[in-house]
Every structure is written in structure tokens, then in C-alpha cells.
């Protein structure tokens, strides 16, 4: 049986994602698969590629032929280089840098709020102290005028 590693289309119109599957070469594009070894979603930035390397190596080893599209995916993940014994087996897969998790973001916002509260209370205390200082300066000036009378 001639097997191929190819893409099986999933999703809705204009928003397709694919499963990387092992199929008999004579079956329909979306027909019954022998095995599903991964997924490919071109709609995300960067595209999401998840391929089970161990199973891909097995199927390549027993003679399954990848289609051009799957061959490109295997090169990106480094599975093709690993199978052929070439340099660069790590592949060129780009991953999204994980941003700070929700808890860290909440802590950062709370810390910023505390800083703002502290700055505001400091400014209020400073304004109050200035007002008291101004009041004490005015009070002695009035007392000598009262004594003169």
C-alpha cells in the first residue's frame, strides 16, 4: 500500500486549518486517515505547527511519501533534516514569546496603583503642610498688628 503524509482540511470557509495525516495515496483529500500525526494552522501569527516527531520519523522510515506542503512543514520543524541526517535538525520553527501570565500582570497593575496612591497621599500631605506653614506665617503677622491697637 502506497502511503502519503498529507494535509486533511478542517475548519470553516475562509478559515481553514489542517491535520497532518497518514493516508493511502488513493483516498480522497478529506477521507479516512490511517493515523493523525499533527496539526497546522496557517491563520495564527506565526503559523501553528504541531507534529509528533516520533511518529513522523516512523512513517518516513517505512516509506510514506510527504506531499510538497507537508515536506515544507517537516523542514520547518526539523523532522526532514533529522530523517535525512542533515545538519540543522533543529529546524526553523518560530514560536511566540510567552507574555507575562495573568497573575503577573495583575500584580504589576496593583503595584502601579499602590505607587500612584502613595504619590497622591504624599502630594496631599505636602500641600497640607504648605497650607499650615502659610497659615502660621500669616498668624504672627496679624498678632503684632493687634498689639499695636
UniProtKB/Swiss-Prot annotation:
GO molecular function: structural constituent of ribosome
Transmembrane annotation, as ranges: none
Region described as Disordered: spans on this chain: 115-149
GO biological process, one term: translation
Record keyword Transport present: no
Gene3D superfamilies associated with the record: 3.30.1320.10
Sorted UniProt keywords: Ribonucleoprotein, Ribosomal protein
Composition skew (Basic and acidic residues), residue ranges: 119-131
Gene Ontology, cellular component aspect: cytoplasm; small ribosomal subunit
Biased composition (Acidic residues): 139-149
Family: Belongs to the bacterial ribosomal protein bS16 family.
UniProt name for this protein: Small ribosomal subunit protein bS16
Gene: rpsP
Amino acid at each position: 500500500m502506497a502511503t502519503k503524509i498529507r494535509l486533511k482540511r478542517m475548519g470553516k470557509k475562509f478559515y481553514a486549518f489542517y491535520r497532518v495525516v497518514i493516508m493511502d495515496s488513493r483516498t480522497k483529500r478529506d477521507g479516512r486517515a490511517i493515523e493523525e500525526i499533527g496539526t497546522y494552522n496557517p491563520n495564527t501569527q506565526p503559523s501553528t505547527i504541531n507534529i509528533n516527531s516520533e511518529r513522523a520519523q516512523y512513517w518516513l522510515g517505512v516509506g510514506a511519501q510527504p506531499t510538497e506542503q507537508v515536506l515544507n512543514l517537516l523542514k520547518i520543524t526539523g523532522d526532514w533534516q533529522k530523517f535525512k541526517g542533515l545538519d540543522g535538525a533543529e529546524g526553523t520553527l518560530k514560536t511566540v514569546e510567552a507574555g507575562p501570565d495573568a497573575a503577573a500582570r495583575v500584580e504589576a497593575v496593583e503595584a502601579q496603583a499602590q505607587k500612584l496612591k502613595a504619590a497622591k497621599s504624599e502630594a496631599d500631605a505636602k500641600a497640607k503642610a504648605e497650607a499650615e506653614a502659610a497659615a502660621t506665617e500669616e498668624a504672627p503677622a496679624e498678632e503684632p498688628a493687634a498689639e499695636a491697637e
